[in-house]
């Protein structure tokens, strides 16, 4: 599956969080847990994906667009997420 993203949002995330949307493929290639973000109607399906990037649990927000995953967010998991999600991923 192809990965797309807004280049400006990617640069902002690299600068502010030290994470690069271009590395999302490494997360998707491993064991992940994905849930649909149904907190509100965004006008499109949004998926929250938990997975490992270089040994660290990260959270990626994306929307499926045809054969692509369009990344809109990427961040390090917080302590509560690590506690809750890590056992489900068996990490």
Feature-to-residue mapping (PLM):
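Ribonuclease/tRNase effector modules and their secretory precursors
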Residues: 1-91
